């Protein structure tokens, strides 16, 4: 066999004739290192985020540790140094989860029992929370009818949010733990401690506003008294006005002319046989309108004489259109036939004051006060049988009644 010259690495790799080649060397072992404390970096411009080792799955809710992420330049900071040392082996802190759960366990709140509609309950509880004091203290002030503590607006709000009969019945039939009930149910239970709360609140509201109502009523009564004196004077003026008598005497002429016809029957009247049913919506209103129209008569008269420059648009504010037309036409006739009667309103100087009397409205206000006094009497009678729960309320009521008398 001829020898072949082999050089370099090939000479080392070539097996010697007649020998088995040695096995290849084992690969080097993988480096063994513990998981680092900071094992991930996220470079985001000026700041960076380092990921902590994922903790074991929590078995209970723990109180959170709140921190704020740093977004400014970290160069030269402690966090920058930790980043540069990232290649060093870092050992994660081993935490005792059981101890953490013992120290920082968040106790789950017991679920409240709701017996009523959640939307209605939330709205009412929100308004009650906005009251100026705790509800028990306010109920104490209500029973004492203390106006220095509870104002009329708060009273009206409490009246609005008084429990209904259905709500009270639902709570009365509940046999479970009342401490486990929701806020709205607790609110209702507090209100239900006061017997007939709504009736007492209405008495309290009446007491609060009584002084103002009586003052306003006295002022209106004085106006009525003065107006009645004016009314008596007006009656004298009406009876003594010769011009008004002449006007009234001429009205049947218009009516008899309008009532002519084969199917109307005998409707002719003498000057003293008619009432102002068509020429007035209300008697006082008629006289007031008559006064206004009389002042406009010259314009109406000029219009009838075809002088459009001084014409006037007729007033149509009265609900009865036919009445307005009849009245205006009659005034127009007076302007043409008896112009000396046009200043009749000068004989009725008390007309305007007397027309402002609102006896019906005044009577309604007086009647409303009488009804509320009757309600006060009923609640006072019922409260006297409540015992200690309404004792303070009864004492204040009796004191208020004595002041009114």
Curated annotation (Swiss-Prot):
Alphabetical list of SUPFAM superfamilies matching this protein: Formin homology 2 domain (FH2 domain)
Protein family according to the UniProt entry: Belongs to the formin-like family. Class-II subfamily.
PANTHER family: FORMIN-J, FORMIN-LIKE PROTEIN 15A-RELATED
Highest taxon in the source lineage: Eukaryota
Pro residues bias locations: 18-31
Protein name: Formin-like protein 15a
InterPro entries attached to this UniProt entry: FH2_Formin, FH2_Formin_sf, Formin_homology_domain
Pfam families from the UniProt entry: FH2 (PF02181)
Gene giving rise to this polypeptide: FH15A
Domain FH2: 52-405
Stretches the record annotates as Disordered: 1-31
Coiled-coil stretches: none
Signal peptide from the UniProt entry: none
């Amino acid at each position: 066999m001829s020898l072949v010259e082999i050089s370099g690495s090939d000479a080392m790799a070539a097996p010697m004739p007649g020998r088995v080649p040695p096995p290849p060397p084992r690969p080097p072992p993988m480096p063994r290192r513990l998981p680092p404390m900071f094992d991930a970096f996220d470079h985001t411009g000026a700041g960076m985020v380092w990921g902590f080792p994922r903790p074991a799955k929590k078995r209970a809710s723990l109180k959170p540790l709140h921190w704020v992420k740093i977004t400014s330049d970290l160069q030269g900071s402690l966090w920058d140094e930790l980043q540069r040392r990232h290649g060093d082996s870092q050992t994660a802190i081993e935490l005792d989860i059981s101890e953490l759960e013992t120290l920082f366990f968040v106790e789950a709140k017991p679920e409240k029992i709701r017996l009523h509609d959640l939307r209605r309950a939330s709205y009412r509880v929100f308004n009650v929370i906005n009251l100026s004091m705790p509800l028990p203290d306010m109920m104490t002030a209500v029973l004492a009818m203390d106006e220095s503590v509870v104002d009329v607006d708060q009273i009206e709000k409490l009246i609005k949010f008084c429990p209904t009969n259905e709500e009270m019945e639902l709570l009365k039939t509940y046999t479970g733990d009342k401490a486990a009930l929701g806020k709205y149910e607790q609110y209702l239970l507090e209100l239900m401690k006061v017997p007939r709360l709504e009736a007492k609140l209405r008495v309290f509201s009446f007491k609060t506003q009584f002084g103002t109502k009586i003052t306003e009523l006295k002022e209106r009564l004085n106006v009525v008294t003065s107006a009645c004196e004016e009314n008596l004077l007006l009656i004298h003026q009406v009876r003594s006005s010769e011009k008004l008598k002449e006007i009234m005497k001429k009205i049947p002429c218009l009516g008899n002319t309008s009532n002519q016809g084969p199917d109307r029957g005998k409707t002719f009247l003498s000057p003293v046989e008619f009432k102002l049913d068509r020429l007035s919506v209300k008697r006082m209103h008629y006289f007031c309108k008559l006064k206004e129209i009389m002042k406009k008569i010259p314009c109406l008269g000029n219009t009838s004489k075809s002088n459009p420059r001084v014409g006037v648009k007729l007033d149509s504010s009265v609900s009865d259109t036919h009445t307005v037309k009849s009245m205006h036409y009659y005034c127009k006739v007076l302007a043409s036939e008896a112009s000396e009667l046009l200043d009749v309103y000068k004989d009725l100087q008390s007309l305007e004051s007397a027309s402002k009397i609102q006896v019906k409205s005044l009577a309604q206000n007086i009647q409303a006060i009488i009804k509320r006094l009757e309600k006060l009497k009923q609640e006072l009678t019922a409260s006297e049988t409540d015992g200690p729960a309404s004792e303070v309320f009864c004492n204040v009521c009796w004191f208020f009644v004595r002041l009114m008398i």
